[in-house]
Amino acid sequence: MNTSIAFIGGGNMARSIIGGLLKQGFDRSRLHVSEPYEPTRTALAEELSLQVVNDNMQVALAGQVWLFAVKPQVMKAVCAELRETAQAHKPLIISIAAGITAAQLDAWLGGNLPVVRVMPNTPALLGAGANGLYANVRVDSGQKHIAEQLFRATGLCT
């Protein structure tokens, strides 16, 4: 996969996805991570040998795919920050945030975007998860394939 991925949020689930991708030989130079919490940022950078920043916009501009791994209570604010850029670049949007629908995410980012909503489970942290994926009507077959490849790094996909 020759896709650049912007991880907006670098918590445990993002870490497991990134770790799985690296184990599969994914080019780490195509992984861009933003994480607001300094101790998590430092740990992620050291553990996975990645540059991790505290700048969602910088990361978003580097990614063809935006993977949102932020707490649900901050999702709307994060989307507001990135809305203009999302509309200008039309990235594939993937979210693992609990309780946020694909329709909400699309609306918060300005609409008419390809959005995949993923429900990973806890065993994904060990690479043994089962991930349920839902794609809205704007997600094409190539984008579905990308989303499936990303989450196969943590287990099964349906």
Regions found by a protein language model. Give the residues of each.
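NAD(P)+-binding Rossmann beta1-loop-alpha1 motif at the extreme N-terminus of oxidoreductases
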Residues: 1-61, 128-129
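Short alpha-helical
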Residues: 12, 39-40, 73-74, 100, ...
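Non-catalytic structural scaffold of enzyme domains
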Residues: 19, 42-47, 65, 104-107, ...
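Hydrophobic/aromatic beta-strand patches that form the interior of the parallel beta-sheet core
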Residues: 32, 53, 94, 116-118, ...
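Rossmann-fold NAD(P) dinucleotide-binding segment
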Residues: 54-109
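Internal alpha-helical scaffold of NAD(P)-dependent oxidoreductase catalytic cores
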Residues: 104-114, 130-158
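Active-site capping/gating segments
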Residues: 116-132
